[in-house]
Amino acid sequence: MILDAAFHGHKTNAEAFQELSDAAVDVKWAPNGVIYHQKTITVDDTTAAVGTGNLTPQYYSTSRDAWVLDTNPTDVAAIAATFDTDYTAPPSGRPPEATPAPNLIWSPTARASFLQHIDQAVQSVDVTSEELKDRAVLSALDKAARRGVNCRIVLTENPAWANAVAEVSAAGCSVHQFPDTGTGLYIHEKIILTDNTKLIIGSQNLTTTSLLENRELSLALDTETAPDVVAAVESTFDADYAAAPGP
């Protein structure tokens, strides 16, 4: 197991690290200088759970998150290989190069794939993210809305991205935001669904750090490879969009 140590990770994960070590689990701290934000659990090199949520039970009942069980052999092999590389690599200030696979979008090289998905949208783009701050993503959403793509975004309110919300709203995106009450639904899920057929889902928030610096992983799925997953994400997004207050 690799546990994040950067930002507030060391403090958050210290108790778990000690408990796992005491149980003879091979657990290792990620390098201090890099945020390891990837959320995966790989079992027997046959199945990888790829998620948007942290393994922190206090948030299970109030956070919107999702996990996808991936049994594609190429995906699972690449996820396992990248884990092995991360586990053994010496600290360098940047995550090692990940093992590529067609359905995987790795950070720190994720931004181009995210922009491509948005730029290729013809009819619609639906977005949830804990954060909305990356300049290039904002520009892509702005352009999509202005060319007539139906752009919908669901967030939890936060002053840190109020200007971003105002910008994409002015371009034509419809942004619905849940109030940050501490007890109501908190949007932590990270998805981009385009034309109700192509889905990015995983750990990347729409921030520059998340897309270009951290270790992160999202799946790139569609209605041919994972129709049930896409349908479930679409249905859940529609429900959250309807429930969250609009402008």
Give residue ranges: language-model regions.
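Glycine-/acidic-rich phosphate or pyrophosphate-binding loops and their flanking alpha/beta elements
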Residues: 107-118
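Long, charged amphipathic helices and adjacent flexible linkers at domain junctions
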Residues: 93-104
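PLD/PLD-like phosphodiesterase catalytic module centered on the HKD motif
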Residues: 1-48, 53, 57-88, 95, ...
